[in-house]
Amino acid sequence: IEAFWKWWPSLRNDLHTLRITGGEPLMNPGAMQFFDLLEDEPAPHLEITLNSNLGVTFDRVDRLIARVKSLIEQKKIRKFSFFTSIDSWGEQAEYMRTGLKCDHWERNMKEVIKAGATVNLMCTYNVLCVTNFQKLLHKVIEWRKEYGKEAVSFDTPYLKEPPHWMINILPEEFIKHQEDTLKFIEDNMDWFTGVEYEKFKRVTDYMKENPVSDLKILQGRRDFYSFFSENDRRLGTNLLEVFPEYSNFYNLCKNIYENYDNRNK
């Protein structure tokens, strides 16, 4: 941090984009200190992007937004955009990201949009997204209807490691869920962009082609049961209560795990 403050005077006039990430920047006093500095030392050509999980208190978000809104209105910065992670909606999303509360997250996200910032959703598309991702897409449409199509964007990179989170370990019958979600985007192109469609189609094609080796799929299925059974035990959660449609797959993974365990005793 000290090195940055010393560097900033020479950096300020030539820097066009600054991304503040973490950790959680809104828990770091240095982030607000930087926005305070911009009040006295404007950078009207500067675009600032900030990463946050939006799980912090309302007060922290409100203080940031008030400062950012002031900087934009006074043209002391050029633009502010926001990146945050979410992979579905409701109890499924909360299961995937321990500690996430969708109502809390949504309230904070809306305050960011109201300040004039673009919110970019980073969706890490994983094994648990396939049957319920449409829930998030419905919310995206809702937010775009309320705040404008440009207010919220989303990206869908698929997760490749660790194997127990890969979509490729799912049986073929899950492809129907993936195709249904792609069709939902196609049927609602008034609210989605061509880029969003193509990126999700890429995920769908990757799931269908499944270039992953049989050995890695076997490893992923074994680890799926190992990880989520232990995760549920430690956190007091229950995967099959939240994702009942995964019951047959879960039992398949359990059998693989138990057979592997028995062979190695």
Where are these regions (language model features)?
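Core AdoMet radical
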Residues: 1, 12-29, 41-65, 71-106, ...
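Conserved RecA-like ASCE ATPase "motif II neighborhood" in helicase/translocase motors
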Residues: 1-7
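A short acidic, amphipathic alpha-helical/loop segment
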Residues: 7, 30-37, 63-67, 111, ...
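A structural motif corresponding to the C-terminal end of an alpha-helix
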Residues: 7-14, 41, 71-78, 108-119, ...
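Helix N-terminus capping/helix-initiation residues
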Residues: 101, 171-172, 236
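Flexible glycine/acidic-rich beta-alpha junction loops that bind and position SAM and/or redox cofactors
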Residues: 125-131, 148-182, 197-202
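Catalytic cores of alpha/beta
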Residues: 127-143
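Radical SAM enzyme core and accessory elements
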Residues: 186-265
